[in-house]
């Protein structure tokens, strides 16, 4: 079983992430993690923090000379701004006199609509939103991307599975039907909004610029694709073992994500059955190989991968920190007020794609090891190849 945890706050000294259950023999370095974290900082519409934020990565355990050892892999992502926040976010008690006059130490009592601020203050009994927003911040996703690097390496090296993402909508601008799905991350990452269609990308950039001029924010939709999945990852026997349920749960756990659909998703609900499913046809005369005429299901049927590309879309809401804040209540006085304005992005949809890749990869790695087992990459690859050879229908 692959398990993962993260710890740390947005302006704390570091984020810490641990993943357990990966086999020995995965080739991975701290440079690989740094490269994935750099991808997370990509995208037109990111805030000022991206211009100076640097993710200092250190592998603390589970890897030796660029190869995993089979034990828990632990990573720390240090906060290069920590000296500015050391007194405000100190884990140990601080003399109030040392905080006096420090602007960033002032209580945050005007919760933002759309953020975790108010519900978190109510749940944990805080009179200040700072403890809530520090952990609820999307900065935490840097730790998940770090762990996803290991999962993506396993999928690629043991099973030949590649996980990529691309942006299909920002605000009201969408990629038109019929545009082929990308197969290369390099081409997607070279685009300013990580869109595979150049004409749509230009319109997306313009949409972001208009929102920025209006002191507003934008959400959008990301599509995640996993190429090379074999049939049979996941199971139909219990709801919590269904691969789509597992993936959807992790994707919905990403900050600001409000919806998930597999394949044609909600569009399928408006079709008749005769036009909603993927017909099965022979892949070649005289063989027992099969293929699908379409991939409307997104590579999942009955909670299991079908062997077609896995395709899942994720809806991200507009960021709730606005430079022209919405109305709220100052909880220290009970009076009407405007929400706090924390430094943030106009649009973080391109970056969200990198986070969704990480979470899909972690779930697929868990499902693949559940199916094929193995304490090393070599062993699980042998088991996987044996499974493919044993398939009566392929």
Swiss-Prot record:
GO terms for molecular function: chorismate synthase activity; FMN binding. Pfam families: Chorismate_synt (PF01264). The keyword Amino-acid biosynthesis applies. One of its GO terms (cellular component) is cytosol. One of its GO terms (biological process) is chorismate biosynthetic process. Its EC number is 4.2.3.5. It catalyses: 5-O-(1-carboxyvinyl)-3-phosphoshikimate = chorismate + phosphate. FMN binds at residues 135-137, 255-256, 302, 317-321, 343. The keyword Amino-acid biosynthesis applies. It is an enzyme of class 4 (lyase). Keywords: Amino-acid biosynthesis, Aromatic amino acid biosynthesis, FAD, Flavoprotein, FMN, Lyase, NADP. Residues 270-291 are annotated as: Disordered. Its cofactor is FMNH2. Reduced FMN (FMNH(2)). NADP(+) binds at residues 40, 46. Pathway: Metabolic intermediate biosynthesis; chorismate biosynthesis; chorismate from D-erythrose 4-phosphate and phosphoenolpyruvate: step 7/7. Homotetramer. This reaction introduces a second double bond into the aromatic ring system. Belongs to the chorismate synthase family. This is Chorismate synthase. It comes from Frankia casuarinae (strain DSM 45818 / CECT 9043 / HFP020203 / CcI3). The lineage of its organism: Bacteria, Bacillati, Actinomycetota, Actinomycetes, Frankiales.
